[in-house]
Amino acid sequence: MNFHVLTLFPEMIEAAFSTSITGRAMEAGLLSLHAVNIRDYAEEKRKGRVDDYSYGGGAGMIMQAEPVYRAYCAVADAIADRTNPRVLFMSPQGRTFDQTFASELAMEKDLIFLCGHYEGIDQRVLDEIVTDEVSIGDYVLTGGELPALVMMDTIARLVPGVLSNEDSAQTESFMGDGLLEYPQYSRPEEWHGQAVPPILLSGNHGAVDRWRREQSLLRTALRRPDLCREAVLNKKDRKFIRENGLEELYRGARNLD
């Protein structure tokens, strides 16, 4: 997976993405990062400035179309022989980013992220190059760099080989069946008067799997009831839901068997 980020702050992207799991994945050649400084494509007479006043007035400055377009073309031309990349513009007005969308994007070879700043970017260049406007939530940040990093981290985890344990990505919240992940415990067996659930010490793998599944069902119902109707359930799930009075929350959920 090749990530290309058009930004005014490439050092911010590089520093964050070059650590931990994503950093090791880059060293292993599973991921690559190309952070492009949009200022490098400013008109020479403007000496690196890429913003100007907004037509019609209003507070703040607007990123100009031409430097953004030049930066995009530099990336698109460099990878034109292998892909027609999606261009993702970080915007609170866009499609909400979720695990399903991440899985879709993880199938791409190259992704271009466009990070805005100031009061926004000239609409004309957005209309010309952007394929997807994407939001990570109903709030406003100072720039698109943090949303881009959130998306890149989520997508990177789905690239084969990035996680040392491939099962990790499949058992986490929102994956596959749409449920939240079950609670996790480690040593010691007792901490601050709280003991690890005995079932996890039993050695009965089938019982452990069932307990974890039931905890996922309960946790989703309690913490994210909005997800229940999109869950994928089996017969044992349905029985547990009936026994715990959760039918209404899970009404409409899909059947696995």
Label every model-predicted segment:
Residues 4-6, 34-36, 88, 111-112, ...:
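Hydrophobic/aromatic beta-strand patches that form the interior of the parallel beta-sheet core
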Residues 175-232, 236-239:
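Long, charged alpha-helical interface segments
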Residues 64-117, 123, 160:
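S-adenosyl-L-methionine/SAH cofactor-binding core of RNA-modifying enzymes
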Residues 20-25, 103-107, 129:
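Short, solvent-exposed amphipathic alpha-helical segments in soluble enzyme
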Residues 59-62, 96, 118, 122, ...:
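Gly/Ser/Thr-rich beta-alpha loop segments that engage phosphate groups in nucleotides
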Residues 232-257:
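Short, amphipathic C-terminal "tail helix"
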Residues 1-78, 201, 206-229:
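N-terminal nucleotide/polyanion-binding subdomain common to many enzyme families
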Residues 121, 125-170, 174:
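Structured adenosyl-cofactor binding patch, chiefly the S-adenosyl-L-methionine
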